[in-house]
């Protein structure tokens, strides 16, 4: 099992800007078990993070001769366009890391629900057992 924040992959990918011209900007991507960090090429700039809990899916994969284009769709339905070199398969790496994250979260949710259900069942059984005990009368006799 991987530790949270473990780096799975580093390398170059490009993000399409939100500006009117929609130019492609090179970023250094760092993929971990719970997020994708995008570092600008300039020194001292802060990275942007896409945490997996806010990513819905990786979509719209298209291959051209040189690039693979893909879109990350967030839980608020925002679409962020990326491209990477055809042989780098960043889209597959991000998709697999996202699926792994979602599976881990689903297992945690399942365990939490099961523990809550077991605690509720134990409390109900204890309450039922308490109701079944005869009340003691004077002198400790029922």
From Swiss-Prot:
Free-text comment on this protein's domains from its UniProt entry: The PH domain binds phosphoinositides with a broad specificity. It may compete with the PH domain of some other proteins, thereby interfering with their binding to phosphatidylinositol 4,5-bisphosphate (PIP2) and phosphatidylinositol 3,4,5-trisphosphate (PIP3).
GO cellular component term of the entry, any: membrane
Localization annotation: Cytoplasm; Membrane
Gene3D superfamilies: Pleckstrin-homology domain (PH domain)/Phosphotyrosine-binding domain (PTB) (2.30.29.30)
Gene label: PHLDA2
Protein purpose: Plays a role in regulating placenta growth. May act via its PH domain that competes with other PH domain-containing proteins, thereby preventing their binding to membrane lipids.
The keyword Flavoprotein is annotated on this UniProt entry: no
Protein name stated in the entry: Pleckstrin homology-like domain family A member 2
Topology in membrane: Peripheral membrane protein
Family, as annotated: Belongs to the PHLDA2 family.
Major site of localization recorded for this protein: cytoplasm
Residue ranges of every copy of the PH domain listed in the record: 7-99
């Amino acid at each position: 099992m991987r530790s949270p924040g473990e780096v799975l992959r580093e390398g170059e990918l490009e993000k399409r800007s939100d500006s009117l011209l929609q130019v492609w900007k090179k970023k250094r991507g760092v993929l971990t078990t719970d997020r994708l960090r995008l570092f600008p090429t300039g020194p001292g700039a802060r990275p942007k993070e896409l945490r997996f809990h806010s990513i819905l899916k990786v979509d719209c994969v298209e291959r051209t001769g040189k690039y693979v284009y893909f879109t990350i769709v967030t839980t608020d339905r925002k679409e962020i366009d990326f491209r990477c070199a055809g042989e780098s398969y960043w889209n597959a790496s991000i998709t697999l890391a996202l699926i792994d994250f979602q599976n881990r979260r689903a297992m945690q949710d399942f365990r939490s629900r099961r523990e809550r259900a077991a605690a509720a069942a134990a409390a109900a059984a204890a309450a039922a057992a308490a109701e079944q005990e005869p009340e003691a009368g004077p002198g400790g006799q029922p």
